[in-house]
Amino acid sequence: MQRRTFIKSISAMMATSTTLGCVSNSLATEKHVSITDFGLRPNSGDDAIPALQKALAYCKKHPGTSLIFPLGRYDFWSTKADRDFYYISNNDDGIKPVAFPLTEFKNLIIDGQGSRFVFHGGMVPVIVRESSGITLKNFSVDWDVPFHCEGIVEAVNKKESYVDLKIKDGFSYKVENGRFIFVGEGFENPVIKNLLEFDTKRQKQAYMARDNFQREIQPVTTEIRPGVLRLQGKYPTWPKVGNTLLLMQERRDWPAFSVQDTKNTWLENIDIHHSGAMGVIAQLADGIKLDNVNIHPKDGSGRTVSTTVDATHFINCKGHVVLKDCLFQGQIDDGTNVHGMYARVAEIHDSNTITFELVHYQQLGIDIFKPGSKVNFSDSVLNVFHDNVVDKTVRQDAKYWTVSFKEPLDTALKVDDVLDNMTWQPDHVMISGCRFTGNRARGALLTVSGKIIVENNYFSTPMMAIKIGSGGLKWYESGPVESVEIRNNIFDNCNYAKDSSAIDIVPGRKSKATTPYHQNVKIYQNEFRVYNERVLTTSRTQGISFVSNKIVKTSEYPERKSAFAPIHVERSSNFVYQGNDFIGFGHSELLFIDGQLVSGSGKLEGEG
């Protein structure tokens, strides 16, 4: 197996010469080394970084080594960690201290043997870059002081527009000049991005609680007594006394794992209890598997939040992407995203050459087009009208690249059209035996052309459980899908924070186009437990089947009337609907096909 990372480690290089002399020759032949051989003991409270730098320098010189951490707690401080500038897609770029900078490693196993890795200050635990055959297993990741803040609502005064909040133990902050400031080990952040209400008993986003984005206008904050804050400002939905209010900071600086330009990366038996960004972010990874990777607050911590944004995210990866027996709980965004990245045509130079732009500021610097890559070009409504092969690329800066193609470009090409790398797409995406619950936003966002299988999972998410979209004007996430099977899953009262369907298959750019975008989606033998009656919404999809599913009406949340039918189909063809069992609905108007409600028993077949 292989794994790889992305850092140019200056301090590790400096440590190499002294390290190798400290390790006996017998260790080099055994291919197993212990972190204790480099002077670090578990539960010592010492900074693990100096010993780890020596150990990694040794492992880099000896491909095929297993680095063992005997069971215990290990502490990592940012002050002595290797630093480099990183572009990490969908996160914030910048100079980042990294505990495990695995750049240009081969066939390395890091085995924590059940240990707890605790990090201090702003840092990234692991970056795997330009490496192959990397396995990371058997440890947990956490921070002593988290990057966000949580409190229990003590009082709500709508007339004077404030909420009183008792801050939970274990969170650090200060108030200066009427402003709340996040305080961590070695960092401060004065900007609240979002105030979000969670149901304390359910440990889920509160029913129909909306995002309360702050950013430009921060709440006026007063500490009315020790540990109790009064937050005065606007609230689109008012929290309830006794519920939990999350104070989320704006930055995405500190993901737990970043995987970049790698081949065959495995994460096994890992708990990610917290991070100051995503849990696992992979870009341009050729083969990546997460097996029993559990993202959730540590038991007994009193925390509601695990990762401060998505649990996992995979961008322009190829080969296989596998999520097996994972838990995604408490992340303040989606459980997983698997997609490509559209680039915008910024300038057309001649018949073979363009300059493209990476649009979103958190996608800059990612070299998504390489010589030999097959590229599709799409118009404003995402119809593919041309394909070509990259001949050469010239990077202008982090935002713009000039690209020459092997064949003449289509004369219909214009500025603002988009291009997508079809070479860097997964052949196979498997999500099996996973649990998505207790988060903000969606479960799985899937928009790649390879074979996608979603089976034997449990979804209980505040928005869509499965979103097949792409093409939005903000993130420029590419698609479409060509082969999806969604089978034997449980969808348990999703959409309790937004009126939407459990499964939503709609392109991200709104248009009146009737041409197919997605194709070949099979949804069968699933159980949908729904309080709001909404099950499936699809548009511009060719070849969709909804077969042998069980749909049960529940009273888990207050019923909400919707303008959408349980099965809502627009501008789609080859629609197959049969053998479905609706329980507790009390009416037969279950289908909406291109403007017409259709009554049926669940055994209708036809084309929309």
From Swiss-Prot:
GO terms for cellular component: plasma membrane. Its EC number is 3.2.1.n1, 3.2.1.22. It is a lipid-anchor. It is found in: Cell membrane. The lineage of its organism: Bacteria, Pseudomonadati, Pseudomonadota, Gammaproteobacteria, Alteromonadales. Gene3D superfamilies: Single-stranded right-handed beta-helix, Pectin lyase-like (2.160.20.10). PbH1 repeats lie at residues 262-292, 318-340, 426-448, 449-470, 481-507. A lipid is attached at C22 (S-diacylglycerol cysteine). InterPro entries: Beta-barrel_GLAA-B_II (IPR056441), Beta_helix (IPR039448), PbH1 (IPR006626), Pectin_lyas_fold (IPR012334), Pectin_lyase_fold/virulence (IPR011050). It comes from Shewanella woodyi (strain ATCC 51908 / MS32). It catalyses: Hydrolysis of terminal, non-reducing branched (1->3)-alpha-D-galactosidic residues, producing free D-galactose; Hydrolysis of terminal, non-reducing alpha-D-galactose residues in alpha-D-galactosides, including galactose oligosaccharides, galactomannans and galactolipids. PROSITE patterns: PROKAR_LIPOPROTEIN (PS51257). This is Alpha-1,3-galactosidase A. It holds the Pfam family Beta-barrel_GLAA-B_II.
